[in-house]
């Protein structure tokens, strides 16, 4: 899709826009001890006092636009793994030059590190690394319980015991749409 700007002010500060770009989350690994999928990458920009809402702790400066069309891509989520298969990687979301990476896939096969991405996938071995937070690692012995997927603000937890996987990491809360809403949490 596109975001079309058809007219702008002569004052550059008045052409500021807030944005939030959240990528697709990843699928969790298959089997009973698969790792959780990582959250899609989360990017938010705001310009005060033009857009005075309560932003997430990850907020940066918003964008200034000109009269043109800006490309927008909304990333899809990854499919869950079946049996012992890995989950699918999330797809990137893009607004203009701002890209949020898709979430890192949760692993199903024992001993395999979680996928890298916007937030790392939970591992059936080590947790995945990320643009945001990392995924948790599996419990190694005597059996493997997968790690949780990373969230926008908190990493996924490691597997807790042979039968309890790690919790997914917390997302980020923003009121960009007028209501405090948490987004981009990791899978457990």
Spans of features found by a protein language model:
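Glycine-biased low-complexity/repetitive sequence motifs
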Residues: 1-188
């Amino acid at each position: 899709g596109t975001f079309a700007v058809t007219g702008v002010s002569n004052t550059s500060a008045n052409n500021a826009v807030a944005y939030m770009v959240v990528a697709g989350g990843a699928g969790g690994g298959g089997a009973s001890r698969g790792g959780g999928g990582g959250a899609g990458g989360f990017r938010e920009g705001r310009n005060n006092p033009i857009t005075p809402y309560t932003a997430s702790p990850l907020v940066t400066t918003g964008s200034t636009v000109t009269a043109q069309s800006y490309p927008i891509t909304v990333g899809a989520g990854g499919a869950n793994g079946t049996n012992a298969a890995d989950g699918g990687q999330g797809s990137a979301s893009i607004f203009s030059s701002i890209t949020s990476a898709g979430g890192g896939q949760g692993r199903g096969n024992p001993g395999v590190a979680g996928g890298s991405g916007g937030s790392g996938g939970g591992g059936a071995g080590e947790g995945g690394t990320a643009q945001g937070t990392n995924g948790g690692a599996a419990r190694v012995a005597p059996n493997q319980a997968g790690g949780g997927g990373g969230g926008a603000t908190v990493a996924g937890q490691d597997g807790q015991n042979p039968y309890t996987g790690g919790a997914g990491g917390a997302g980020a809360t923003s009121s960009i749409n007028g209501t405090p809403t948490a987004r981009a949490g990791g899978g457990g």
